[in-house]
Structure formats: C-alpha cells, structure tokens
Amino acid sequence: MVIGILGVQGAVREHQEMLHLLGVKTMIVKSSADLDGIDGLIFPGGESTTIRRLIDRYGLLDVLRRQADTLPMFGTCAGMILLASELTEGPSHLGAIPMTVRRNAFGRQIDSFETSLNVEGAGQDIEAVFIRAPFVEQVGEGVRVLAAIGIAAVVVETDLHLACSFHPELTSDRRLHDYFIQKIRRRTAVSV
C-alpha cells in the first residue's frame, strides 16, 4: 500500500512519519503524475487558502476533483476545508464530501487547544490538537459523524473519505491514521 500526501504546504513530514510508523509507504504528491499508483491521499493541515493557491499553481485542482470520485482521501484541519462541498464563507475547493464547514470555528491561534475524543470506530480518548480549527456545521447524504464537540462535528466520513478538524499527525496517537489505512484496505478487498 502507498498513501500519497499532498506536499504543497502544511504538516507533510508529520503525516509521512506517522504512516511510516504504521508500516505504510508514502508518496509526496506535487504533480498529477505523483497520483499514479497511490491507494489513498492525505490533505495535511496548514493554511487552506495557501494550499488552494498552490494546488492551482501546480495544476492539480481538476485532477484532484476527478480523483475524489474513486480515491480515498483523508483531510486534517485545512484538509477538511479542502474536501468540503460547501464553506460558510467563500467558495468550496474539491467538493469531495457533502458537508458545510466553518473555517476557524473554534477561534484564532490563541484559542488553540488539545483534548481527547471518542471517535466511533477508531477508539476512545484519541488525542486531538485543534489549531485555528474548522468544524462541520451540516452534513449531507452519506456522511457519518464519528466525533463531535457539543454540536460541532469534528470527525466525519463517507464510504470513501475521512476528515477531521484537528491535527492527529501532531500527536503520538496513530489510531486515526490506522483507521484511514483500514478504510482503504476494506475498499480494496471489496473491489478485488
């Protein structure tokens, strides 16, 4: 198995290290050719506007939108914003997950926090680092909420994709990455 990590900006190295600890090969994706032969793709946390500009500069937007129909994707923090079909302010990016996301929903940088979450299917007390984090205000058809803080959904999935508001790659807790790996394996087993 090879999982790609969008390598234009953000916590790329941290995701790569997490996947290596789980025994998974990685590919840093900076061009459409880098998408060949990967089994899944992670959109790391970072600054969503900057990531979008770089996606456009590298000519990746259209190919990523097409890949979103068949390639499992996992978005963390800014990656969740990129995968959303709708944002409360501004245009959407990839539209891979039918959900409405609010950027910086928990406040500014100074309001960043850490907590533990119970994530359905992935485990109890999962470490979660929230930095200028978004949350999901509304989910569409086929989207399951796996964890929430109050009424704010912070981990969601579809049959194909996974997204979270926080940075699991900035902790030592590998369970959310492992959940994504198992999601890919289940999909691969079904399609064989």
From Swiss-Prot:
Entry's EC annotation: 4.3.3.6, 3.5.1.2
Highest rank taxon of the organism: Bacteria
Keyword vocabulary terms for this entry: Glutamine amidotransferase, Hydrolase, Lyase, Pyridoxal phosphate
Family according to the record: Belongs to the glutaminase PdxT/SNO family.
Protein name: Pyridoxal 5'-phosphate synthase subunit PdxT
Active site: C77 (nucleophile), H167 (charge relay system), E169 (charge relay system)
Residues engaged in binding L-glutamine: G46, E47, S48, R103, I131, R132
Gene responsible for this protein: pdxT
Gene Ontology annotations for the cellular component aspect, listed alphabetically: cytosol; glutaminase complex
TM segment ranges: none
Pfam families linked: SNO
Single GO biological process annotation from the record: pyridoxal phosphate biosynthetic process
Function, in words: Catalyzes the hydrolysis of glutamine to glutamate and ammonia as part of the biosynthesis of pyridoxal 5'-phosphate. The resulting ammonia molecule is channeled to the active site of PdxS.
Pathway participation: Cofactor biosynthesis; pyridoxal 5'-phosphate biosynthesis
Subunit structure: In the presence of PdxS, forms a dodecamer of heterodimers. Only shows activity in the heterodimer.
GO molecular function: glutaminase activity; pyridoxal 5'-phosphate synthase (glutamine hydrolysing) activity
